[in-house]
Swiss-Prot record:
Motif Required for filament formation per UniProt: ranges: 849-850
Region (Disordered): 290-312
Name of protein: Major DNA-binding protein
ZnF (unnamed) ranges: 503-516
Organism: Equine herpesvirus 1 (strain V592) (EHV-1)
Superkingdom to which the source organism belongs: Viruses
Principal subcellular localization: host cell
GO function terms (MF aspect): single-stranded DNA binding; zinc ion binding
Cellular compartment(s): Host nucleus
Recorded family membership: Belongs to the herpesviridae major DNA-binding protein family.
Alphabetical list of SUPFAM superfamilies matching this protein: Viral ssDNA binding protein
Length: 1209
């Protein structure tokens, strides 16, 4: 739903400021933990944060003085042109940056970036962007301000639209407008920056010769100021701003990108192309032209011709690539002029920094920064990440009877960094002579290993971004369970310490921190690229709204669905009957019963029931009964209200239900550090081009694309087609009207030198009065699996048929430990069955106990009457839940159990059958102090004396962790209470695929849907991810309480990793699961097993209780043998395995019949749900009578065999 137009009043502002601060006034600890700086350069990028880099009164949305124009009779008057914009979320330190700590100690990253730049053919910064440029050095600026160069740091804060203007030297410093502000209680000076176009009335274009003071465009009466050129600042902008944009847009001439973006800032009415005409393209064999890539579509064009049309296809692919890039740059300019509601973050409002004294605050900030390593690492480790979307492929026209019609899916982005070093061609496909000798890598990605060059390419060859990215990769520890000896970083470092490693970046002293050492440690997680396919893309973004529909049934029975047209009922009354409000009441009711704690639901913590609730077997049975009655009562009332009071079509509403969330396009929501801002911008470029590419075939259809003027002629058409897609289901936009809040415009007096004070005698004219502001990306996921429709194509039918088997619910009985109440059974096993452990072992063992029970191997003499009653209640509850369960997720706490149970009851009322629904899981990132010496190699800060000194040096780092606030590593925990995680307004990483389709008959508008999808890479991306088509994952890093106040998978290569091996052991079960798991991990990791923490064990087994027992085994080794060693651990395993079968029923001895321990038959237990709308509830476990006035016919219950058997094998 589009919002009503709003009016915003903006203050007039220069296009940017140069801040001058005393180095001693910088909060170097806080700044260093949020900055991006390479150890071999003093240049740095900082986040723009009030109280840290700018003053508390800093205004983000402004009307920029962008030029001048003549007015009045004879053109004798001057009016200033004003353009709306907002300030870029990053500040650029170009002088005195050495005071800021380096993000990583990895040496020579600038050299690494330049080597990758040369390999892939992107232009370097080697000379001023314009001719006859005169340097304005940092020392000169300090002298002009009467500041000491040795104690002063300078950085640029610039508006989003005009950052490229600074690079191309089309700006000047107005020293006369210098003002003093207060930042963190210290004085700072800031110099305003204005465009040189002020001196050139009526000129809406770049000045190609800004240093020509006698240019004819300069007004006769004006005193022209020297333009601002600082080589270090331009180098920094070249790397951080232009490099990532050039890689994302596939334009190797970075100056061309800068000039195009700068021109769009000056000419708001420009709709044509702005990228150079001589853009080059990467040579590779397109899917469309490659025989053997599937069916006949591989070589077929619209007219079915042969080689002639294959060449035409190559031209169309290259044309689609450059036109999509041009449109994306144009839309990025529109976004740069956008006005956003979110205020610039203030360091005083960060809860993470208010936890105590300075030391504690820095530790908290370092821990939070380490949390982000999970998200940033996912963007690096995922093969379909936007970081690697570097080429455009042509899938060819569609098959079938409509194959000749334009397709929205012909052109698409592919992840192919491995072909970036191929020869380059012009738009006609001719190889450029200076690249002809370069080796061409095949497009199928064979024999291509991930290297540092690819990482530098993903970073846009910016050493500052690469350093900060390594900052996060150095903290990626959880999940590295490859178990291969050659990946052990300690051994690699020891073996290579005294030899020459051909990386060209490090020496013996710097090798521990070298980027190649970090990549070697993580190389089993690095992405593997295969043949390009049209696939989802992995994106990074931020939830800036606390509202999402991520409960189990999504937006089922939402406010919009319940509200009747022309009904004057109060909105609050309608909201009370929605599914969302009902779930809130249910959770509140469980909290009042002291069964859950709402505060822990969003923390992905164990969320176990309080120990005071269960103190014996009777109280446990009462707990199960209480949970069951509460949930069934809430579901009954909810469905009765929908049917009787709301006349809601419950089955149709279920078919239309979606999980939904919104990712903000506000630049300040992702501005924690320069890398998060960089990832958000790369995401925007990828999403924009995905949408634009869908329209290219429609544009080319029936046209002669070989024409010289085709691109210039049709570029405005493509731009308009994209703008017509706004508010079409995916990208939302709002119309904003802007006005000027100041009566007079404060600007330099153009008739006097720049050292003179400004004047307020000018009038201002807003160039853009009304604009579209892009707000957010809408992501959705259907709750129900749809197995096809009448209008589906043959290819779609085949795809759905392949997925149906994954969604079909198997006909099998429940499993206790992996069932509805498995988490409660494991948590309270010691209370319920204190004797439930193998002989000779004093620790209660639920795996041993329930395995023997379900295999009918438990001696009946060991079970008391109370034990049997408890077992019966547990089995009955599990059976009843399993009979109606269509959610392919296992509850981990009472909150999840309540949500799943409630949703299953609703599904039952709606006659849902056969298929699982789509489930959501949030993987929440956390942090901890490292324990493994291999994880701290990058932080070794002393000289290593030989190979034998590597591990002692690492151990010294572990012993001094308390003195290093940045020494944390990332962890993962998962929860299925996704909405409560989304309430924390987190930064997220998800897979996204965008569907495009036309509306109803006669409607040619293109609608879109952002479909929640997966990340390629599976457990390499995150150890808690599973290849399961019925689940959708989101990686989340909460912001509430830290930096703000409360307010499917692709075809990646799958390996038999240790994690999969362990999961297989757990799924097979057995009386001593932890022994088998511990033995497998010990065999794979060896001595590293002793460093595994509970978080690591959870990452392996995805079971907190089993993880706790595994963690205790490490302590048991030390207790029994005095010290931990591999041999001692193996001896412990051997002793425990000897007791594995102990306690099982002996031959001829009576065994307890587990299958017969439930009084009611399965048919009776399931009928209790059919009678759920009865006015009176029967006692727990008894069949309920069906009332005569049932609301709707639920049909006969499914037939089940009278005896359910369980076999964990």
């Amino acid at each position: 739903m589009e919002s009503a137009p709003k009016t915003v009043s903006l203050p007039v502002s220069p296009l940017g400021y140069v801040y001058a601060r005393q180095k001693a006034s910088l909060q170097t600890g806080t700044v260093s933990l949020t900055a991006a700086r390479s150890v071999d350069s003093d240049l740095a990028v900082l986040p723009v944060i009030r109280g840290l880099t700018v003053e508390q009164t800093f205004t983000t949305n402004v009307a920029v003085v962008a030029g001048s124009k003549t007015t009045g009779l004879g053109g004798t008057g001057i009016t200033l042109k004003l353009t709306p914009s907002h300030f870029n979320p990053s500040a650029f330190v170009f002088y005195g940056g050495s005071v800021i700590g380096a993000s990583s100690n990895a040496p020579n990253l600038t050299r690494a970036c330049e080597a990758a730049r040369r390999r892939f053919g992107f232009s370097a910064f080697s000379s001023p962007p314009v001719e006859n440029a005169v340097e304005t050095s940092g020392e000169e600026i300090c002298a002009s301000l009467n500041l000491s160069p040795e104690t002063t740091a300078l950085y640029l804060v610039v508006t989003e639209s005009f950052k490229e203007m600074v690079y191309v030297c089309n700006t000047f410093l107005h020293y006369g407008g210098t003002s003093t502000v207060t930042i963190d209680g210290q004085d700072a000076m800031k110099i305003p920056i204005y465009p040189v176009q002020l001196y050139m009335p009526d000129v809406n274009r770049l000045a190609s010769e800004p240093f020509n003071a006698k240019h004819r465009s300069i007004g006769d009466e004006f005193v022209y100021s020297r333009p601002f050129f600082n080589s270090d600042l331009c180098r920094l902008l070249h790397g951080y701003v232009l490099g990532p944009a050039a890689v994302a847009l596939r334009v190797r001439n970075l100056d061309g990108v800068a000039r195009g973006a700068a021109h769009l800032a000056l000419d708001e009415n420009h709709e044509g192309s702005v990228l150079p005409q001589d853009v080059t393209f990467t040579l590779f064999d397109s899917t469309q032209g490659n025989a053997g890539k599937g069916s006949g579509r591989a070589q077929r064009q619209g007219d079915g011709s042969g080689s002639k049309n294959s060449a035409s296809s190559g031209i169309e692919r290259r044309l689609a690539s450059v036109m999509a890039a041009d449109t994306a740059l144009s839309v990025d300019s529109i976004m740069g002029a956008g006005i956003y509601d979110t205020e610039l973050p203030s360091v005083e409002d960060w809860p993470v920094l208010s936890s105590g004294d300075d030391t504690e605050s820095l530790e908290a900030l370092g821990a939070y920064a380490a949390r982000l390593s999970g998200l940033v690492g996912a963007m690096v480790f995922s093969a379909n990440s936007v970081l690697y979307m570097t080429e455009v492929d042509d899938g060819g026209p569609a098959d079938g009877k409509d194959g000749s019609n334009p397709s929205y899916h012909r052109f698409y982005l592919i992840a192919a960094p491995y072909v970036a070093g191929n020869p380059q061609t012009d738009k006609d496909g001719r190889v450029l002579p200076h690249t002809a000798d370069q080796q061409a890598a095949p497009i199928n990605g064979s024999n291509q290993e991930f290297s540092l060059d690819y990482l530098a390419l993903a970073c846009g060859f910016c050493p500052q971004i690469l350093a900060r990215l390594l900052f996060y990769l150095e903290r990626c520890d959880a999940g590295t369970f490859g178990g291969r000896n050659e990946t052990d970083a300690l051994r690699y470092l020891a073996n290579t310490l005294e030899s020459d490693v051909p990386c060209g970046l490090c020496n013996q002293a710097t090798r521990p921190a070298c980027a190649h050492t970090t990549l070697h440690r993580l190389r089993q997680r690095l992405p593997r690229f295969g043949a390009p396919v049209r696939a989802p893309i992995g994106i990074f973004g931020t939830m800036n709204s606390a509202y999402s529909d991520c409960d189990v049934l999504g937006n089922y029975a939402s406010y919009g669905a319940l509200k009747r047209p022309n009904d004057n009922e109060a909105p609050k009354s309608i909201m009370q009957d929605t599914y969302r409000a009902t779930m809130e009441r249910l959770v509140n009711e469980l909290e009042q019963a002291k069964l859950i704690d709402k505060e822990t639901l969003a923390q992905a913590s164990p969320c176990s029931a309080p120990t005071s609730v269960v103190h014996d077997q009777a109280s446990f049975i009462g707990l199960l009964s209480n949970i069951k009655d509460t949930i069934e009562g809430a579901a009954e009332q909810f469905m009765r209200t929908l049917v009787e009071a709301r006349d809601f079509k419950i089955r149709e509403g279920l078919a239309d239900a979606n999980h939904t969330m919104s990712i903000s396009l506000d630049p300040y929501s992702s501005s924690f550090c320069p890398v998060t801002s960089f990832l958000a911008r790369r995401t925007v470029f990828a999403v924009l081009q995905d949408l634009v590419l869908s329209q290219c075939h429609c544009l080319f259809y029936g046209q002669s694309v070989e024409g010289r003027n085709f691109r210039n002629q049709f570029q405005p058409v493509l731009r308009r087609r994209f703008l017509d897609m706004l508010n079409g289901g995916f990208i939302t936009a709002k119309t904003v009207t802007v006005t000027v809040s100041d009566s007079g415009v404060l600007a330099p007096d153009l008739t006097r030198p720049a050292s003179e004070p400004p004047t307020k005698d000018y009038d201002g004219d807003m160039a853009r009065v009304s604009m579209e502001v892009l707000r957010d990306l809408r992501v959705k996921n259907r709750v129900l699996f749809s197995n096809g429709g009448a209008n589906m194509s043959e290819a779609a039918r085949a795809r759905v048929a392949g997925m149906a088997s994954a969604y079909r619910r198997p006909d099998k009985g429940s499993n206790i430990l992996n069932g509805a109440v498995g988490f409660l059974v494991k948590q309270y096993h010691g209370v319920l069955f204190p004797r439930g452990h193998p002989p000779g072992i004093d620790t209660p063992n639920p795996q041993w106990f329930w395995t023997l029970l379900q295999r009918n191997q438990m001696p009946a003499r060991l079970l008391s009457k109370e034990d049997i009653e408890t077992i019966t209640a547990i089995k009955r509850f599990s059976d009843e839940y399993s009979a109606i369960n269509f959610i392919n997720l296992t509850p981990n706490n009472i909150g999840e159990l309540a949500q799943f149970y409630f949703a299953n009851l609703v599904l039952k009322y709606c006659d849902h059958s056969q298929y699982f629904i789509n489930g959501l899981t949030a993987i929440v990132v956390g942090s901890r102090r490292p324990r493994d010496p291999a994880a701290v190699l990058a932080w070794i800060d002393r000289t290593i004396n030989g190979a034998a000194d590597v591990e002692p040096a690492a151990q010294e780092v572990l012993q001094r962790l308390g003195s290093n606030p940045a020494a944390w590593t990332g962890t993962f925990t998962s929860t299925n209470m996704v909405r409560y995680v989304m309430d924390q307004r987190p930064m997220v990483v998800i897979g996204l695929s965008i569907s495009k389709y036309n509306g109803s008959a006669g409607n040619n508008r293109v609608f879109q849907a952002g479909n929640w999808n997966g990340l390629n890479g599976g457990k390499n991306v995150c150890p808690l991810m599973a290849f399961d088509r019925t689940r959708r994952f989101v990686l989340a890093c909460p912001r509430v309480g830290f930096t703000c106040e409360a307010g499917g998978f692709g075809t990646g290569v799958r390996e038999n990793t240790l994690s999969e091996q362990v999961r297989g052991i757990v799924s097979e079960g057995g009386p001593m699961v932890q022994t088998a798991v511990f033995a497998a991990v010990l065999h794979a990791l060896g001595a590293r097993t002793q460093h595994l923490a509970v978080d690591d064990w959870i990452g392996l087994v995805d079971d907190e209780f089993l993880a706790a027992s595994l963690d205790a085994l490490n302590a048991t080794v030390v207790d029994q043998f005095g010290e931990w060693s591999v041999e001692a651990a193996q001896e412990l395993v051997k002793n425990m395995e000897a007791q594995t079968t102990a306690g099982a029923v002996a031959a001829g001895e009576g065994a307890f019949d587990f299958g017969a321990c439930v009084g009611d038959t399965p048919q009776q237990s399931t009928s209790a749900f059919n009678g759920g709308l009865a006015m009176a509830a029967a006692p727990a476990g008894q069949k309920r009578s069906l009332p005569d006035d049932i609301l709707f016919d639920m049909g006969a219950p499914p037939e089940k065999k009278s005896g359910l058997t369980f076999d964990m094998l």
